Amino acid sequence: MKFSLENIISIRDFKKSDVEYILNLAEEMEPIAKSQKVCHEKDGKLLGVMFYEPSTRTRLSFETAMKRLGGDVVGFNQKQGTSIQKGEVLYDTAQIVSQYTDAIVLRHDMEGAARFVSNIVDVPVINAGDGAGQHPTQTMLDLYTIKRTLGELKNLKIALVGDLKYGRTVHSLVYALAMFNVEIVFISPSELEMPPEILRDLEKLNCKFSIKNSLIENIDDVDVIYMTRIQKERFPDPKEYLKVKGQYTLTSKNLKDSNTIIMHPLPRVDEIDFNVDNLSNAMYFKQAFYGVPVRMALLDSIIK
């Protein structure tokens, strides 16, 4: 089995065999990610990170992943202090970074930015989030978390909760879940429902889904609850954000006697109470760690 992609732009570019290849390779990478083994596979290779939007987990896990593989990292994690402040456009910045590095990881506020850059440079490009568009590497670590926790991906029932309109993590995740015959339950305020074009795509993919408003009533009816924060920065009107803020909050009381796996791409705001953290089925911090072996697998597959 081989990995067929040269760039990681959208989960929709993946074949099921690509997904399975990365998940299997990530498991091989885990001992290296945990410092139990040393790897020199990417000695002498440089990863360029271009982060136009804030990031903690994605940026740090990519940097960790590259260094665990034996490579190194250069780049920026904010516009301040770069020529972007002087008016340099994405095209020029990407051209320059591509001259210095063996691959680029890009986070940008414009949907389609990663695809655009992949078409103009000669090195592999990884989409680390493009506005409200896609976040394919998050999707891969989400799948890996589910598989490592439950032992399989097929025939599960998964609830996606919160900001389904602007959340790029769920926009990516649903297409991958559809590959594995997963039933999806969408739970959100009516103002933040999954975009209709994505629902139409799921229908074409014969993916079973339902749309609901109550989180509490559905906790024990699913295998996984995937919480998301309400993304304040995506709202054109702050008043609209205040209308939906805090509508869904998981507490240990809600989850009493429940074995449902709790996931979250993080950061959280108020949607998961801190008293949930110590529950055995709270997987979001382990989920964040799994970003390292998964991104190691992706980097290893596209950097030659």
UniProtKB/Swiss-Prot annotation:
Chloroplast as UniProt keyword: no
Domain of life: Archaea
SUPFAM superfamilies: Aspartate/ornithine carbamoyltransferase (SSF53671)
InterPro entries xrefs: Asp/Orn_carbamoyltranf_P-bd (IPR006132), Asp/Orn_carbamoylTrfase (IPR006130), Asp/Orn_carbamoylTrfase_sf (IPR036901), Asp_carbamoyltransf (IPR002082), Asp_carbamoyltransf_Asp/Orn-bd (IPR006131)
Pfam families tied to this protein: OTCace, OTCace_N
Catalytic activity: carbamoyl phosphate + L-aspartate = N-carbamoyl-L-aspartate + phosphate + H(+)
Protein name per the record: Aspartate carbamoyltransferase catalytic subunit
